[in-house]
């Protein structure tokens, strides 16, 4: 983007993007491009162990749900598809926000974005589980002022979080009913999932 069109001498609102379960940071490129074309800065990350693949600082791949066998899936869902995983994912967004405010990313690299971002206007957007991550981010972080969930997945929210009004603008774009409420699977495997299914 740098060099194509001179950046105006102004600050732009920031949107943090959270991908879905097993997704990637670039999975919603068309929506991100549209937002950037309309004056937003969008930053995305891969959620380690919950993206289809990420890489550590030495370039080694970190696959999705590392070391979780098919036999362990049900227990994995009970433990991680509740509040814990969504909170880990929110911590990734909080880290992004903290990092983008720094003057430099390391001793050799100046942060070219810090001075063009309006940190008083930060929002979050996510797809599926990223929508739940966005909602938790709005509850926990005063800097996140608004959110959008694209077919949001909210089954991982604890009752207290699911019933809390953020008092912030939040748009959920998705179907009225995610699944048949009588099915077995992720919803019933989650301690809070069955109850929160009825809320959303």
Where are these regions (language model features)?
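Domain-level recognition of soluble alpha/beta enzyme cores
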Residues: 1-14
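The feature captures the conserved acid-bearing segment of alpha/beta-hydrolase catalytic domains
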Residues: 6, 145-200
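Short beta-strand element of the alpha/beta-hydrolase
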Residues: 11-20, 33
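A fold-wide structural signal in alpha/beta-hydrolase
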Residues: 13-14, 36-48, 146
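Serine-hydrolase catalytic-loop signature spanning alpha/beta hydrolases and amidase-signature enzymes
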Residues: 22-24, 42
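The serine-hydrolase catalytic nucleophile loop
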Residues: 25-30, 47
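Alpha/beta-hydrolase active-site loop
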Residues: 49, 54-119
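Primarily recognizes the serine-hydrolase "nucleophile elbow" in alpha/beta-hydrolase
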Residues: 96-164
């Amino acid at each position: 983007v740098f060099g194509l069109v001179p950046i105006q001498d102004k600050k732009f609102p920031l949107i943090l993007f959270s991908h879905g379960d097993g997704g990637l940071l670039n999975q919603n490129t068309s929506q991100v491009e549209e937002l950037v074309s309309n004056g937003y800065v969008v930053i995305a990350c891969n959620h380690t162990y919950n993206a289809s693949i990420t890489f550590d600082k030495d370039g080694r791949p970190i696959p999705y749900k590392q070391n979780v066998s098919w036999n362990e899936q049900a227990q994995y869902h009970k433990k991680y598809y509740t509040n814990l995983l969504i909170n880990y994912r929110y911590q990734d967004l909080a880290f992004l926000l903290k990092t983008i405010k720094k003057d430099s990313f390391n001793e050799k690299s100046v942060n070219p974005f810090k001075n063009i971002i309006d940190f008083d206007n930060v929002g979050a957007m996510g797809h599926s589980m990223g929508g739940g991550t966005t909602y938790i981010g709005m509850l926990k972080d005063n800097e996140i002022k608004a959110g959008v969930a694209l077919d949001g997945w909210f089954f991982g929210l604890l009752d207290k979080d699911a019933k809390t009004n953020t008092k912030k603008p939040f748009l959920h774009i998705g179907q009225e009913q995610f699944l048949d409420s009588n099915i077995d699977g992720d919803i019933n495997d989650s301690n809070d999932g069955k109850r929160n299914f009825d809320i959303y």
